[in-house]
């Protein structure tokens, strides 16, 4: 999909454009779209005509946790993908869109990671059978949701490759809702197979420039920005945004100069904004595979060197997993070296218990392939295995 030396232009704010065409507040957007197919076709054709190289299909909330019970997940996604294809033709890329389910993962909520993976697999199976050009995992607020979605893609796309974009949304703290900083999110997403990474919603383009500066030294994949049209404000009972298309275009140039390769718009960005982006003719920064060592928990990353303070632990079959997790969380160190000397049952219980605690990043030590597979599946960060 990537064009040599040129940015890829995504679409803009589909939801707000649909509201202009009659989508009421509080209804299921996917169900409304199926009942009003001309509305989504109008919006997506407008973005294509404005210069979008790739358009997100309206499958954002088309999962079993958000859809009404009478709608079949597979059929709903298939129909929404078909409407998108009819709107944009075959010369524009179509992306299957995945978003948060609205339910929190355990222990903040009741949903398990295994259940979330199965929820996403239902959508992705429809993407696979339809033949989408790429998949986007967007507006993610919990890095574990990102990991589950990427694992679901791996489970469905075992015999062919489909590019996967990941974009997260940040709070005013500069971190995801569950505390993951942008660099850690990038490293975890890359480790689990993301083909591009970045940000959507959250803020205007001006606030995304320093975020790119943080990521570029460590990014081995293209970087995405899909910002809002500045800050929202209420005017005459309506939400309007602070940046017009020309000011947005000015900042998009800065985004590209600071490392963005794939650019679109989120809240408040109409086809006019996408047209402004498409008028830009500026080269993108070359992407290279970065070589460095790191260990990440879900909230922090350590780049080991001579000054790194390590704590050494051993996990055995005699270990009580939950208490052990708290021992690790209390360790006075930068990172943990954990020798695995237990069976799969104890390791699984330990890894599941990590979701209850915030531990320093862990470097796992085992040459057992079955145990390595469990670590890849259940670890809450992205940690190397020795």
PLM region descriptions:
Residues 1-386:
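Domain-level signal for soluble alpha/beta catalytic cores
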């Amino acid at each position: 999909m990537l064009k040599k030396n040129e940015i890829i232009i995504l679409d803009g704010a589909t939801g707000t454009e649909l509201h202009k065409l009659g989508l009421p507040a509080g209804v299921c957007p996917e169900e409304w779209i199926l009942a009003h197919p001309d509305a989504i076709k109008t919006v997506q054709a407008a973005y294509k005509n404005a210069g979008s190289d790739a358009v997100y299909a309206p499958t954002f909330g088309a999962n079993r946790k958000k859809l009404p019970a009478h709608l079949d997940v597979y059929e709903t996604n298939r129909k929404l993908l078909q409407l998108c294809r009819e709107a944009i033709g075959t010369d524009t890329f179509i992306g299957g869109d995945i978003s948060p389910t609205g339910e929190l993962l355990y222990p903040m909520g009741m949903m398990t990671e295994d259940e979330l993976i199965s929820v996403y697999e239902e959508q992705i199976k429809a993407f696979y059978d339809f033949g989408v050009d790429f998949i986007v995992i967007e507006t993610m607020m919990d890095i574990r949701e990102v990991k589950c979605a990427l694992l679901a893609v791996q489970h469905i796309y075992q015999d062919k490759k489909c590019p996967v974009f990941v974009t997260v949304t940040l709070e005013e703290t500069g971190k995801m809702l569950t505390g993951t900083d942008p660099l850690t999110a990038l490293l975890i997403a890359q480790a689990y197979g993301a083909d591009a990474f970045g940000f959507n919603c959250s803020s205007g383009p001006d606030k995304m420039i320093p975020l790119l500066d943080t990521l570029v030294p460590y990014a081995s994949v293209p970087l995405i920005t899909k910002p809002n049209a500045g800050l929202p404000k209420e005017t005459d009972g309506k939400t309007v945004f602070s940046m017009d298309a020309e000011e947005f275009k000015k900042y998009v140039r800065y985004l590209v100069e600071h490392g963005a390769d794939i650019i679109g718009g989120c809240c408040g960005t109409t086809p006019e904004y996408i047209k402004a982006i498409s008028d830009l003719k500026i080269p993108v920064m070359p992407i290279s595979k970065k070589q460095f060592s790191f260990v990440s928990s879900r909230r922090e990353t350590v780049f080991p060197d001579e000054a790194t303070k390590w704590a050494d632990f051993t996990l055995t079959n005699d270990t009580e997993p939950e208490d052990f997790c708290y021992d690790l969380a209390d360790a006075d160190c930068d990172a943990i070296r954990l020798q695995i000397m237990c069976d799969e049952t104890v390791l699984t219980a330990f890894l599941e218990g990590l979701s209850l605690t915030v531990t320093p990043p862990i470097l796992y030590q085992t040459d057992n392939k079955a145990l390595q597979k469990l670590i890849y599946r259940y670890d809450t960060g992205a940690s190397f295995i020795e």
